[in-house]
Amino acid sequence: MTVSFPFPRIPDPGVPVLVAFSGGLDSTVLLHCLASQPTQRIHGLEAIHIHHGLHEHADAWTAHCAAFCTQHYIRLHIARVHVSHNSGQGLEAAARTARRAAFAHTLQHGHYLALAHHCDDQAETWLLRALRGSCDGLAAMRPLTPFAAGHLWRPLLTHSRAQLLDYAQQQHLDWIEDSSNADLRHDRNFLRIHVLPLLHQRWPQATAVLARNAALAAANADLLNAEDAVLLPDLLDPDGALDINALTAHPPARRARLLRAWCARAGAPPLPERGVNIIERELLPARHDSAACFTWSHTEIRRWRLRLYLHRPQPPWPPDWQPLWSGITPLILPDGGQLHLESTDHDTVPGFPHPLCVRARRGGERLILPGRTHSHPLKHLLQDIGIPPWRRASMPLLCDGEQILAAGDALLAAPLVTWLHAHRLKLRWQSHNNTCI
């Protein structure tokens, strides 16, 4: 008997597909399905196997995947990753992070990364997100989302695991059984082994209903996200900081969404619920001169002068770091940023008359602005132009002996302004420890 199993259709026919291939039942069925489509082979079909190095059979699993791909004439990428045991996020999450990084590194521009999540996985994900109190998370897994240089595609979300098993047996496929899938210490395994079977006894269509709820939640989330995308730009200043007065003009529920959208837009980690609560309770009503802050996942939201700033703390610069810089080539800073001279007429950058020293602030510096006859404390000048305190600490100073010529590219002393103008140059500071991530 032939099992009814419609082949997954790629959203953009003609685009190459990279299949995440663990060797388990789900990814074996997906890869075999796609390999059975001549047109997909013509346009490009490859697989990637992640060797986490965590299981005693990891080498055997890699060999199994290599043999399968050799048998079916599929190019296989094998990515050996290092999973940190001290990341602070747990071993399972650390493995997921390493896996996604390997996928992102391998996926080429515009291509599709195909994952074999199915309807049962979707139901488990919905339950996990519901138990964690994640509202937007109830959308669970999307069929198609942007990822790295291409897209992440889940073509089996409408198929049950039972359908995949029927297909694999009919096609006489071999697959790997991972013993860790029976480890009840993992929440997902507990749901799959104990909770969902109990739900099915009472409601046989429970898995399909939960997966349908995820699709409905995704549709609703898309509508709300579209509204957030329209509202958010009006709340941001040119540096990407969030205007507190504009934010508090919205009701609390919308503020929470806008805060999360702001973090996502800046590439920050997802803002947890406790972060929203602390911002509402402590940051928004704080005094004008408050240094209130919320920290999570090596990221900070700070309040300063009626603005909220996203900030990723960096270690202080080495106290003895003060290289001489000619200006001819960019100078790489300790935080990964750089100083460079930019020509306004595209000529070759000539460099300074003599090398200048670059160092971090020590306190007590003074600077003479153009049109002034006496110097001013650098601290006061930075305050006047609205540079947040935490950014001042990582601002490079360009010095000629004891004379301060520039603080980043925000404050330039009169002699440097004259020289830059004469040579049609601009001083640029690109910081990796930016005000907004």
From Swiss-Prot:
Catalysed reaction, written as an equation: cytidine(34) in tRNA(Ile2) + L-lysine + ATP = lysidine(34) in tRNA(Ile2) + AMP + diphosphate + H(+)
Gene3D superfamilies: 1.20.59.20, HUPs (3.40.50.620)
Pfam families: ATP_bind_3, TilS, TilS_C
Family that this chain belongs to: Belongs to the tRNA(Ile)-lysidine synthase family.
Highest taxon of source: Bacteria
Protein keywords: ATP-binding, Cytoplasm, Ligase, Nucleotide-binding, tRNA processing
Enzyme class, broadest EC rank: ligase
Reported function: Ligates lysine onto the cytidine present at position 34 of the AUA codon-specific tRNA(Ile) that contains the anticodon CAU, in an ATP-dependent manner. Cytidine is converted to lysidine, thus changing the amino acid specificity of the tRNA from methionine to isoleucine.
UniProt main location, coarse: cytoplasm
Protein name per its UniProtKB record: tRNA(Ile)-lysidine synthase
Domain notes: The N-terminal region contains the highly conserved SGGXDS motif, predicted to be a P-loop motif involved in ATP binding.
Any one Gene Ontology cellular component term annotated for this protein: cytoplasm
GO molecular-function terms, A-Z: ATP binding; tRNA(Ile)-lysidine synthase activity
InterPro entries, A to Z: Lysidine-tRNA-synth_C, Rossmann-like_a/b/a_fold, TilS/TtcA_N, tRNA_Ile_lys_synt, tRNA_Ile_lys_synt_N, tRNA_Ile_lys_synt_subst-bd
SUPFAM superfamilies: Adenine nucleotide alpha hydrolases-like, MesJ substrate recognition domain-like, PheT/TilS domain
Organism of derivation: Xylella fastidiosa (strain 9a5c)
Localization per Swiss-Prot or TrEMBL: Cytoplasm
Residue sites binding ATP per the record: S22, G23, G24, L25, D26, S27
Entry's EC annotation: 6.3.4.19
Cited CDD domains: TilS_N
Biological process per Gene Ontology, one example term: tRNA modification
